[in-house]
């Protein structure tokens, strides 16, 4: 899953702005943006956040304070109603802390022919399966459509756009959603695919994209809310499958500390403890 970036030339996408919206773990969002920037030259890169000042300047990344983003509802409202005024390119690549460009060589110029592309959702009819907003390419047409008062329900914004209002967006706004085959080539979220994709979304895929020392350090930036989530448990399983038991143990410790002590979590903790003597722990990271 990890491309060889030493031999892969950077892709130039002057038509695309890269952005993330994050006030919970902006430091991780900034690192995810940097990982995408390592493979692609974008027209502009922006981190929308609130009340956060990076410890060191972020080279090539604009940081814009957008006021409080306290919930998923606030996130959806900004992406639909606030983001459009900040985007001046034909397209924007919307990402989150747990998704980034995976293989720039998998980019297809045909992606720009569509108004919305995101990783397909599983167990959905083809007509509403595209797709996830956590790593999604959106056109100006889509952004402007999101401002229409006809969109009354905003959250979750990707499901509202791609399921609830999709027919209306297609018929009244002329929005073109990418077909499944194009979306599968663009990104994945729920399950990894055998062929290369441009990007991905989902914390449970991180062990295949990052080394253990980096992942171990990333855990320190995540809020308790994450450790209580189903995604955290899926990440623990992925860490064990990737033979990263030390990082899995730390994640599960934080999960139990956050109040999640169900049998499955305790079982995963026991498995991690059994595996640790057989695999090297990650290097220590300075506070």
What residues fall within each predicted segment?
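Alpha-helical linker/edge segments of TPR/alpha-solenoid repeat scaffolds
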Residues: 273-287
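N-proximal low-complexity "stem/linker" segments adjacent to membrane-targeting elements
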Residues: 1-34
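Generic structural signal for small/hydrophobic residues in well-ordered secondary structure
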Residues: 45, 97-98, 139
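Short beta-strand-to-loop acidic/aromatic patch adjacent to the donor-nucleotide binding site
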Residues: 89-100
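Catalytic core and acceptor-binding pocket of nucleotide-sugar-dependent glycosyltransferases
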Residues: 130-247
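Short, acidic, metal-binding catalytic loop of nucleotide-sugar glycosyltransferases
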Residues: 34-43
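Active-site-proximal specificity loops/subdomain of glycosyltransferases
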Residues: 48-90
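Conserved donor-nucleotide/metal-binding helix-loop-beta segment in metal-dependent transferases, i.e.
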Residues: 100-129
